[in-house]
């Protein structure tokens, strides 16, 4: 299984099951509007960190912060009810 698909699947499961101690469950359990706002703040924060790492030309930090950005974007997508398959289909459309 593709590692990104596996992470996405885990995120979806944790949103549904809300296991105790799960970061994803904690981030997504408020009412939907509040949860989405919190997730959007994290996406913005992580995007800024990627930009700063890129400006510093710090490859290791770019990779680390990009993983955080992609993760939090996946949480936002999953919380919004978007499946991995829907996202994959959008990428396929753009490969023309």
Curated annotation (Swiss-Prot):
UniProt GO molecular function: ATP binding; phosphoribosyl-ATP diphosphatase activity
Organism: Methanococcus maripaludis (strain C6 / ATCC BAA-1332)
Keyword list, A-Z: Amino-acid biosynthesis, ATP-binding, Cytoplasm, Histidine biosynthesis, Hydrolase, Nucleotide-binding
Cysteine disulfide partners in this protein: none
InterPro entries, per the entry: HisE (IPR008179), PRib-ATP_PPHydrolase-like (IPR021130)
Pfam families per the UniProt record, alphabetical: PRA-PH
Protein name: Phosphoribosyl-ATP pyrophosphatase
Gene Ontology annotations of biological process type: L-histidine biosynthetic process
UniProt xrefs under SUPFAM superfamilies: all-alpha NTP pyrophosphatases (SSF101386)
Any single GO CC term annotated in Swiss-Prot or TrEMBL for this entry: cytoplasm
Family the entry assigns: Belongs to the PRA-PH family.
Gene3D superfamilies found in the cross-reference section: MazG-like
GN (gene name): hisE
Reaction catalysed by this enzyme: 1-(5-phospho-beta-D-ribosyl)-ATP + H2O = 1-(5-phospho-beta-D-ribosyl)-5'-AMP + diphosphate + H(+)
Enzyme Commission designation: 3.6.1.31
PANTHER family the UniProt entry points to: HISTIDINE BIOSYNTHESIS BIFUNCTIONAL PROTEIN (PTHR42945), HISTIDINE BIOSYNTHESIS BIFUNCTIONAL PROTEIN HISIE (PTHR42945:SF9)
Principal cellular location given in the protein's record: cytoplasm
